């Protein structure tokens, strides 16, 4: 019985061991299944992450920069960057083409000696976003509500996108993505535009100042070098920079010339008599030595001497400039009293490859808009409102206003010629064709150039001073890794 009992006991133990082993094997199988499941999930997560990263979706929703407590996504940063770059390309197409630069080669080319175009666009994007959020944050913090004019401007801009999308027979989101090059929805675009519009409206209606004639006069007196012009004459005596004897002889000739000058006419006569062989043609003319209307806002050896506040008519000086000695005769310094004009316009664009029929359609549309304005109140304010609704120019939000236009303004000739026509009267209208399309014009008035320039400078000074305070209140931080991935 003992042996049999032991056998049964052993068999029971063996069965228990087998059961335990089977349970252990089941546990291992369950663990392997669980681990396999986790691995599959991890692979899927990595695949999704990789897909989001590869398509840029992840980066676009990461924070690219902050302004105070506001977070700017990579997508929004990309929108601002692309729009700034696109506007620069379209505005400077002729210049860039003459420099042999294209959209694909532009970013690595030098904008200045120390900055590439790509770095310039990045800098401008940072600044634009910062200002937009600073003004928006101030508006919301102070409980500001959009003005009626601001709301109308915003609505007009949104409607312009909707109309353009409808005309192109595509969705609004698709249109925006085509124009901006960013995966942005209409809803996201409206939010960006609203922030920008509310901030600008807040500043213009609560912070911007209006200046009196006395304000402008005082600003001019304090900053005359920014606005004054000067007339002077220059006679140059060249030398070989590597030949000391040549340099000494040139200095002696220049000093003798200066010492012999008694008045402006003597300067003219001596320049003609002492001209080097290659200067005879230039200095034989009475105006060969003359510089008129030189802007004192610039700098240089001659200009720095001319704009010295102690300078008086008849002053003569010999100045060394590179490889010549320049004898300079001061004639006059004066405020620019020439007239500059203010105009409003509505741009209806014409594509470059448009045929005559397409151009005629746009011209007809321009004529109809002008007649619509004439049939209404026909005031400058009503014209400005029409510009906000219909103009494709970048200044549409300002009612199509351009100020301070004069002969030196870099505008298309046909546009500038209409503005500067001496017969022009306040309230005059017309239609001007340029390479950009048809412009419906409104002449708003004229005033002395110095006054227009002083108001613009004073406005900018006050605006920049305000932004300096905002920069302290809303510090900016950039996430360079995200930015580099989205631009």
Can you annotate each of these PLM segments?
Residues 130-142, 254-261, 363-378, 384, ...:
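A short alpha-helix/helix-coil micro-patch that ends at or immediately precedes a cysteine
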């Amino acid at each position: 019985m003992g042996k049999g009992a032991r056998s049964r006991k052993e068999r029971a133990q063996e069965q228990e061991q087998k059961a335990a082993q089977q349970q252990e094997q089941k546990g291992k199988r369950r663990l392997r299944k669980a681990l396999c499941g986790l691995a599959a999930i991890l692979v899927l997560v990595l695949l999704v992450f990789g897909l989001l990263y590869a398509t840029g979706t992840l980066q676009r929703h990461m924070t690219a920069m902050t302004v105070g407590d506001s977070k700017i996504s990579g997508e929004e940063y990309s929108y601002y960057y692309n729009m700034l770059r696109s506007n620069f390309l379209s505005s400077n197409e002729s210049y860039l083409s003459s420099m042999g630069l294209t959209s694909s080669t532009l970013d690595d080319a030098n904008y200045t000696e120390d900055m590439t175009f790509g770095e310039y666009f990045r800098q401008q994007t940072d600044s634009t976003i910062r200002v937009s959020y600073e003004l928006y944050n101030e508006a919301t913090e102070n409980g500001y509500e959009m003005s009626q004019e601001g709301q109308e401007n915003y609505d007009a801009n949104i409607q312009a996108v909707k109309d353009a999308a409808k005309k192109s027979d595509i969705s609004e989101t698709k249109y925006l993505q085509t124009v901006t090059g960013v995966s942005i929805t209409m809803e996201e675009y409206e939010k960006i535009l609203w922030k920008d519009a509310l901030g600008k409206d807040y500043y213009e209606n609560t912070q911007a100042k209006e200046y009196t004639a006395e304000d402008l006069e005082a600003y001019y007196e304090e900053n005359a070098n920014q606005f004054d012009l000067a007339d002077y004459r220059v006679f140059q005596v060249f030398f070989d920079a590597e030949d000391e004897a040549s340099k000494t002889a040139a200095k002696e000739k220049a000093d003798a010339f200066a010492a012999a000058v008694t008045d402006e006419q003597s300067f003219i006569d001596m320049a003609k008599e002492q001209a080097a062989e290659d200067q005879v043609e230039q200095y034989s003319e009475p105006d060969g030595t003359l510089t008129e209307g030189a802007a004192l806002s610039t700098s240089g050896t001659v200009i720095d001497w001319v704009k010295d506040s102690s300078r008086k008519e008849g002053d003569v000086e010999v100045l060394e400039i590179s490889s010549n000695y320049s004898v300079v005769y001061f004639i006059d310094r004066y405020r620019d009293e020439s007239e500059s004009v203010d105009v409003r316009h509505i741009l209806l664009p014409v594509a470059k490859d448009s045929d005559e029929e397409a151009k005629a359609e746009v011209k007809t549309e321009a004529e109809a808009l002008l007649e619509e304005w004439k049939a209404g109140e026909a005031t400058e304010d009503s014209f400005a409102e029409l510009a906000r609704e219909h103009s494709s120019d970048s200044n549409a939000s300002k009612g199509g206003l351009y100020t301070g236009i004069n002969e030196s303004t870099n505008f298309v000739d046909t546009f500038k010629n209409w503005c500067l026509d001496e017969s022009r009267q306040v309230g005059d209208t017309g239609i001007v064709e340029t390479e950009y399309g048809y412009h419906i014009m409104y002449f708003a008035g004229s005033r002395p150039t110095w006054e227009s320039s002083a108001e613009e400078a004073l406005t900018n000074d006050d605006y920049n001073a305000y932004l300096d305070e905002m920069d302290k209140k809303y510090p900016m931080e950039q996430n360079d890794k995200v930015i580099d991935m989205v631009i």
